[in-house]
C-alpha cells in the first residue's frame, strides 16, 4: 500500500505519507484502514503527498474518494481540517478538484506545496515532530 499513517493523540493530528503510484482502490483501502481510538472532536490531518503519483486516477474517482473520506468522519468529529501537501501541478489540481467536489461544513481541506505552510494552517507549532516509529 502506498500509504503510511500515524495518529498523534496529543495533537489531535493524523499524519499520513503517500508514495508511488496510487489507484482508486488503494486510496479507498487506505481510508478504510484508518483506526483512531478516542479521537478529539477536531481532527487535523497533515497529508504529505509530495511523492505520490495520482496519474491513474480519473475525474470520476475524485468524487468517490471524497465520499469515502466524508463517510469515514461523519458522526465522529465536529470538524476535520486537512492540509494536503503536494509537489506538482497535476496533484495540486486533483487535490483542488477533490476539495471542490463537495461542500461540507465538517470537512475543510487546503492544498499546499510547502509543508511548513500546511503545518501553520493546521495550527501545529513549528517544533511539533510528526514521524513514524522505526
Q: Can you name each region flagged by the protein language model?
A:
Residues 1-134:
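Amphipathic, Lys/Arg-enriched alpha-helical "gate/interface" segment within cytosolic domains
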